[in-house]
Amino acid sequence: MPVHSRGDKKETNHHDEMEVDYAENEGSSSEDEDTESSSVSEDGDSSEMDDEDCERRRMECLDEMSNLEKQFTDLKDQLYKERLSQVDAKLQEVIAGKAPEYLEPLATLQENMQIRTKVAGIYRELCLESVKNKYECEIQASRQHCESEKLLLYDTVQSELEEKIRRLEEDRHSIDITSELWNDELQSRKKRKDPFSPDKKKPVVVSGPYIVYMLQDLDILEDWTTIRKAMATLGPHRVKTEPPVKLEKHLHSARSEEGRLYYDGEWYIRGQTICIDRKDECPTSAVITTINHDEVWFKRPDGSKSKLYISQLQKGKYSIKHS
């Protein structure tokens, strides 16, 4: 069978070679046909055997797979039951308080509880001690304030009483002057005759202007006493008399000026540390907090505050100095 190609030259060159090859291959093709017919018959028998074998093996595989699935399910159920029994046993140990997983954290918690309880007890004692100290400081400050107020009240009452005594003494001296008039008046009354006596006094003839006193002698005496008291109190020519009770003089120089305290030639300001000395008591140190017109507030080392009156410094009941 001729082969058509793109060029004619190519067809002529290969024509002879194809004839030679065809003659050689003709003998071999007959042999191949015989072998192929025998192999086809053998392949038909083997294919039937392969199908049966595959079906058989497929069934075996399915059976084996089902067995494996059943075994896996059984193992899974068994493992679940074992794990459940282990968890139940561990839970019973925890409930009974014997599991090490429970005992170790429990011991740690108990140790922490003991430490915190101990710390809380120490803190409680410190708080109680602090409250007790504050209470004692308040009591001490209240007592000192009461003593200061008592001394101030005593000084005030004493000065008022001394002033009253002085005025009474002045009144007594002024009354002594009028008492002589009172005695003279009484003596003159005694010397008078009885008004019911038959002897009558002759009328006095007065020439020129005259004043008729319509007041009684006792009223005139009372008016005279009142005038003498007013003159002794407000008159420009007041006669000063020494009172019987000597007033307490200022032994020390103390005053307050523009927020500063002057005492015995030294100046004190707020914030300075001073030493307070009182008779029959130990000296104490304090810090000046406030300086008013007539009092000085200071703070003691224990935190309590007290005040000191400038009049007490003047009278020498207290003395201060720079610390």
Swiss-Prot record:
Superkingdom in the source lineage: Eukaryota
Transmembrane stretches, start-end: none
Ranges in a coiled coil: 52-84, 149-180
Ranges of biased composition (kind: Basic and acidic residues): 1-17
Biased composition (Acidic residues): 18-53
Covalent link (Glycyl lysine isopeptide (Lys-Gly) (interchain with G-Cter in SUMO2)) residue numbers: 240, 246
Main location: nucleus
Modified-residue entries (Phosphoserine), positions: 197
Keyword Ubl conjugation: yes
One Pfam family in the UniProt entry: Sds3
Gene Ontology biological process terms, A to Z: negative regulation of cell migration; negative regulation of stem cell population maintenance; negative regulation of transcription by RNA polymerase II; negative regulation of transforming growth factor beta receptor signaling pathway; positive regulation of stem cell population maintenance
Keywords for the protein's UniProt record, in alphabetical order: Coiled coil, Growth regulation, Isopeptide bond, Nucleus, Phosphoprotein, Repressor, Transcription, Transcription regulation, Ubl conjugation
GO cellular component term of the entry, any: nucleus
Region (Disordered): 1-56
Disulfide bond annotation, renumbered to this chain: none
InterPro entries associated with the record: Sds3
Compartments, record wording: Nucleus
Family: Belongs to the BRMS1 family.
Function: Involved in the histone deacetylase (HDAC1)-dependent transcriptional repression activity. When overexpressed in lung cancer cell line that lacks p53/TP53 expression, inhibits cell growth.
Oligomeric form and interacting partners: Component of the Sin3/HDAC1 corepressor complex at least composed of BRMS1, BRMS1L and ING2/ING1L. Interacts with HDAC and SIN3A.
Entry protein name: Breast cancer metastasis-suppressor 1-like protein
Organism this protein belongs to: Mus musculus (Mouse)
